[in-house]
Amino acid sequence: MNKYLAELFGTFWLVLGGCGSAVLAAAFPDVGIGLLGVSLAFGLTVLTMAFAIGHISGCHLNPAVTIGLWAGGRFEAKEIVPYILAQVIGGVIAGGVLYTIASGQMGFDATSSGFASNGYGEHSPGGYSLTSALVTEVVMTMMFLLVILGATDQRAPQGFAPIAIGLCLTLIHLISIPVTNTSVNPARSTGVALYVGDWATAQLWLFWVAPILGALLGAVAYKLISGSNKD
Protein backbone atom coordinates (compact mmCIF):
# COMPACT_ATOMS: atom_id res chain seq x y z
CA MET A 1 0.00 0.00 0.00
CA ASN A 2 2.88 2.38 0.76
CA LYS A 3 4.07 2.40 -2.83
CA TYR A 4 0.59 3.20 -4.14
CA LEU A 5 0.24 6.09 -1.71
CA ALA A 6 3.68 7.28 -2.76
CA GLU A 7 2.58 7.32 -6.40
CA LEU A 8 -0.62 9.16 -5.45
CA PHE A 9 1.23 11.87 -3.52
CA GLY A 10 3.97 12.08 -6.12
CA THR A 11 1.57 12.55 -9.02
CA PHE A 12 -0.39 15.03 -6.92
CA TRP A 13 2.80 17.09 -6.59
CA LEU A 14 3.60 16.83 -10.29
CA VAL A 15 0.17 18.10 -11.36
CA LEU A 16 -0.08 20.74 -8.65
CA GLY A 17 3.45 21.98 -9.21
CA GLY A 18 3.56 21.77 -12.99
CA CYS A 19 0.01 22.69 -13.94
CA GLY A 20 -0.20 25.06 -10.99
CA SER A 21 2.76 27.02 -12.31
CA ALA A 22 1.05 27.25 -15.70
CA VAL A 23 -2.33 28.32 -14.33
CA LEU A 24 -1.25 30.60 -11.50
CA ALA A 25 2.19 31.93 -12.38
CA ALA A 26 2.94 31.67 -16.11
CA ALA A 27 1.37 34.97 -17.13
CA PHE A 28 1.24 36.75 -13.79
CA PRO A 29 1.53 40.50 -14.50
CA ASP A 30 5.11 41.80 -14.67
CA VAL A 31 6.71 38.75 -13.06
CA GLY A 32 5.15 35.82 -14.94
CA ILE A 33 7.43 32.81 -15.24
CA GLY A 34 6.51 32.04 -18.86
CA LEU A 35 7.30 28.91 -20.87
CA LEU A 36 10.76 28.47 -19.35
CA GLY A 37 9.43 28.70 -15.82
CA VAL A 38 6.64 26.21 -16.44
CA SER A 39 9.10 23.80 -18.06
CA LEU A 40 11.39 24.04 -15.05
CA ALA A 41 8.46 23.54 -12.68
CA PHE A 42 7.52 20.23 -14.27
CA GLY A 43 11.13 19.06 -14.18
CA LEU A 44 11.53 20.12 -10.56
CA THR A 45 8.45 18.20 -9.44
CA VAL A 46 9.93 14.98 -10.80
CA LEU A 47 13.41 15.77 -9.47
CA THR A 48 12.17 16.46 -5.94
CA MET A 49 9.81 13.50 -5.84
CA ALA A 50 12.46 11.14 -7.19
CA PHE A 51 14.50 11.83 -4.06
CA ALA A 52 11.41 11.77 -1.83
CA ILE A 53 9.71 8.56 -2.99
CA GLY A 54 12.02 6.88 -5.48
CA HIS A 55 13.09 4.37 -2.83
CA ILE A 56 9.44 3.60 -2.02
CA SER A 57 7.67 3.26 -5.37
CA GLY A 58 10.26 4.00 -8.03
CA CYS A 59 8.64 7.41 -8.61
CA HIS A 60 6.81 6.69 -11.86
CA LEU A 61 4.13 9.42 -11.49
CA ASN A 62 2.95 8.59 -14.99
CA PRO A 63 0.94 5.70 -16.50
CA ALA A 64 3.08 5.80 -19.63
CA VAL A 65 6.25 5.45 -17.55
CA THR A 66 4.76 2.52 -15.65
CA ILE A 67 3.84 0.74 -18.90
CA GLY A 68 7.19 1.60 -20.47
CA LEU A 69 9.10 0.21 -17.49
CA TRP A 70 7.06 -2.98 -17.73
CA ALA A 71 7.85 -3.23 -21.45
CA GLY A 72 11.50 -2.67 -20.62
CA GLY A 73 11.52 -5.54 -18.16
CA ARG A 74 11.79 -3.33 -15.10
CA PHE A 75 8.28 -3.65 -13.64
CA GLU A 76 5.82 -6.44 -12.84
CA ALA A 77 2.62 -6.65 -14.88
CA LYS A 78 0.46 -7.24 -11.80
CA GLU A 79 1.39 -3.80 -10.46
CA ILE A 80 0.42 -1.83 -13.58
CA VAL A 81 -3.26 -1.27 -12.81
CA PRO A 82 -2.90 -0.26 -9.13
CA TYR A 83 -0.03 2.09 -10.01
CA ILE A 84 -2.04 3.75 -12.77
CA LEU A 85 -5.10 4.09 -10.54
CA ALA A 86 -3.00 5.75 -7.83
CA GLN A 87 -1.44 8.11 -10.35
CA VAL A 88 -4.75 9.16 -11.88
CA ILE A 89 -6.35 9.67 -8.46
CA GLY A 90 -3.42 11.81 -7.37
CA GLY A 91 -3.64 13.87 -10.55
CA VAL A 92 -7.39 14.41 -10.21
CA ILE A 93 -7.07 15.45 -6.56
CA ALA A 94 -4.36 17.93 -7.53
CA GLY A 95 -6.57 19.26 -10.32
CA GLY A 96 -9.33 19.80 -7.77
CA VAL A 97 -7.04 21.67 -5.39
CA LEU A 98 -5.75 23.82 -8.24
CA TYR A 99 -9.29 24.50 -9.46
CA THR A 100 -10.30 25.61 -5.97
CA ILE A 101 -7.37 28.00 -5.79
CA ALA A 102 -7.82 29.37 -9.31
CA SER A 103 -11.55 29.87 -8.78
CA GLY A 104 -10.73 32.44 -6.13
CA GLN A 105 -9.71 34.89 -8.86
CA MET A 106 -12.49 37.04 -10.23
CA GLY A 107 -13.47 36.09 -13.76
CA PHE A 108 -11.74 32.70 -13.77
CA ASP A 109 -13.22 30.21 -16.23
CA ALA A 110 -11.57 26.82 -16.69
CA THR A 111 -13.02 26.14 -20.13
CA SER A 112 -11.99 29.41 -21.74
CA SER A 113 -8.61 29.61 -20.00
CA GLY A 114 -7.75 26.00 -20.80
CA PHE A 115 -6.67 25.32 -17.21
CA ALA A 116 -3.31 23.93 -18.43
CA SER A 117 -5.10 21.21 -20.40
CA ASN A 118 -3.51 19.52 -23.38
CA GLY A 119 -4.98 19.95 -26.84
CA TYR A 120 -4.56 20.03 -30.58
CA GLY A 121 -6.04 22.03 -33.44
CA GLU A 122 -7.67 25.19 -32.14
CA HIS A 123 -6.79 24.08 -28.59
CA SER A 124 -3.08 23.72 -29.29
CA PRO A 125 -1.17 26.74 -27.89
CA GLY A 126 0.42 27.20 -31.32
CA GLY A 127 -2.49 25.96 -33.42
CA TYR A 128 -0.80 22.67 -34.34
CA SER A 129 -2.77 19.85 -36.00
CA LEU A 130 -3.77 16.45 -34.63
CA THR A 131 -0.95 14.85 -36.62
CA SER A 132 1.62 17.25 -35.19
CA ALA A 133 0.33 16.61 -31.69
CA LEU A 134 0.40 12.84 -32.16
CA VAL A 135 3.96 12.81 -33.49
CA THR A 136 5.15 15.20 -30.79
CA GLU A 137 3.68 13.22 -27.90
CA VAL A 138 4.88 9.87 -29.23
CA VAL A 139 8.44 11.07 -29.86
CA MET A 140 8.75 13.07 -26.64
CA THR A 141 7.51 10.16 -24.52
CA MET A 142 9.76 7.74 -26.38
CA MET A 143 12.79 9.87 -25.56
CA PHE A 144 11.63 10.30 -21.96
CA LEU A 145 11.53 6.52 -21.49
CA LEU A 146 14.88 6.14 -23.19
CA VAL A 147 16.41 8.54 -20.66
CA ILE A 148 14.60 6.94 -17.71
CA LEU A 149 15.71 3.43 -18.65
CA GLY A 150 19.25 4.56 -19.32
CA ALA A 151 19.64 6.71 -16.22
CA THR A 152 18.31 3.93 -13.96
CA ASP A 153 20.36 1.16 -15.58
CA GLN A 154 22.72 -0.47 -13.07
CA ARG A 155 25.59 0.30 -15.45
CA ALA A 156 24.87 4.05 -15.35
CA PRO A 157 26.55 6.42 -12.86
CA GLN A 158 24.72 6.00 -9.57
CA GLY A 159 22.78 8.77 -7.85
CA PHE A 160 22.26 10.99 -10.89
CA ALA A 161 19.05 9.51 -12.30
CA PRO A 162 16.70 12.07 -10.69
CA ILE A 163 18.71 14.92 -12.18
CA ALA A 164 18.82 13.41 -15.66
CA ILE A 165 15.12 12.56 -15.63
CA GLY A 166 14.06 15.94 -14.24
CA LEU A 167 16.15 17.81 -16.81
CA CYS A 168 14.81 15.59 -19.59
CA LEU A 169 11.23 16.46 -18.63
CA THR A 170 12.18 20.15 -18.57
CA LEU A 171 13.64 19.89 -22.07
CA ILE A 172 10.56 18.04 -23.32
CA HIS A 173 8.37 20.89 -22.10
CA LEU A 174 10.62 23.51 -23.69
CA ILE A 175 10.19 21.74 -27.02
CA SER A 176 6.54 20.79 -26.95
CA ILE A 177 4.52 23.28 -24.89
CA PRO A 178 3.75 25.26 -28.08
CA VAL A 179 2.42 22.12 -29.77
CA THR A 180 0.24 20.35 -27.18
CA ASN A 181 0.93 22.16 -23.90
CA THR A 182 3.00 19.01 -23.24
CA SER A 183 1.48 15.90 -21.81
CA VAL A 184 3.76 12.82 -22.06
CA ASN A 185 1.70 11.81 -19.02
CA PRO A 186 -1.92 10.63 -19.15
CA ALA A 187 -2.43 11.25 -15.42
CA ARG A 188 -1.29 14.86 -15.78
CA SER A 189 -3.67 15.37 -18.72
CA THR A 190 -6.61 13.72 -16.97
CA GLY A 191 -6.04 15.59 -13.73
CA VAL A 192 -6.91 18.95 -15.27
CA ALA A 193 -9.08 17.95 -18.26
CA LEU A 194 -11.86 16.66 -16.02
CA TYR A 195 -12.33 20.14 -14.56
CA VAL A 196 -12.51 21.73 -18.00
CA GLY A 197 -14.79 19.18 -19.63
CA ASP A 198 -15.95 20.15 -23.12
CA TRP A 199 -13.06 20.10 -25.60
CA ALA A 200 -10.45 18.97 -23.04
CA THR A 201 -12.16 15.66 -22.31
CA ALA A 202 -13.06 15.20 -25.99
CA GLN A 203 -9.36 15.41 -26.91
CA LEU A 204 -8.09 13.50 -23.87
CA TRP A 205 -7.90 10.20 -25.76
CA LEU A 206 -4.82 11.40 -27.65
CA PHE A 207 -2.97 12.09 -24.42
CA TRP A 208 -3.45 8.51 -23.32
CA VAL A 209 -2.79 6.79 -26.63
CA ALA A 210 0.26 8.77 -27.79
CA PRO A 211 2.28 8.71 -24.53
CA ILE A 212 1.66 4.99 -24.03
CA LEU A 213 2.69 4.24 -27.62
CA GLY A 214 5.76 6.42 -27.18
CA ALA A 215 6.67 4.67 -23.94
CA LEU A 216 6.48 1.26 -25.61
CA LEU A 217 8.70 2.50 -28.44
CA GLY A 218 11.13 3.93 -25.90
CA ALA A 219 11.40 0.56 -24.17
CA VAL A 220 12.07 -1.17 -27.49
CA ALA A 221 14.65 1.46 -28.44
CA TYR A 222 16.52 1.09 -25.16
CA LYS A 223 16.65 -2.68 -25.51
CA LEU A 224 18.13 -2.22 -28.98
CA ILE A 225 20.86 0.18 -27.93
CA SER A 226 21.68 -1.22 -24.49
CA GLY A 227 22.62 -4.68 -25.67
CA SER A 228 20.75 -6.29 -22.80
CA ASN A 229 17.18 -6.85 -21.64
CA LYS A 230 18.34 -6.83 -18.04
CA ASP A 231 19.36 -4.09 -15.63
Curated annotation (Swiss-Prot):
Site note Selectivity filter applies to F42, H173, T182, R188
Checking PANTHER family in the record gives:
AQUAPORIN TRANSPORTER, MIP17260P
Q: What Gene3D superfamilies does UniProt report for this protein, alphabetically?
A: Glycerol uptake facilitator protein
Task: Supply the source organism for this entry.
Answer: Vibrio vulnificus (strain CMCP6)
Check the record and name the CDD domains matching this protein: MIP
Give GO terms: molecular function aspect only.
water channel activity
Protein name as it appears in the record: Aquaporin Z
Q: What is this organism's lineage? A: Bacteria, Pseudomonadati, Pseudomonadota, Gammaproteobacteria, Vibrionales
According to its UniProt entry, the function of this protein is described as: Channel that permits osmotically driven movement of water in both directions. It is involved in the osmoregulation and in the maintenance of cell turgor during volume expansion in rapidly growing cells. It mediates rapid entry or exit of water in response to abrupt changes in osmolarity.
Assembly description: Homotetramer.
Tell me what gene encodes this: aqpZ
- Does the keyword section mention Transmembrane? yes
Transmembrane spans: 8-28, 33-53, 80-100, 130-150, 159-179, 205-225
How does the protein's chain sit in the membrane according to the entry?
Multi-pass membrane protein
> Which family would the database say this protein is a member of?
Belongs to the MIP/aquaporin (TC 1.A.8) family.
Q: Give the main localization category.
A: membrane
State the reactions this protein catalyses. Answer: H2O(in) = H2O(out)
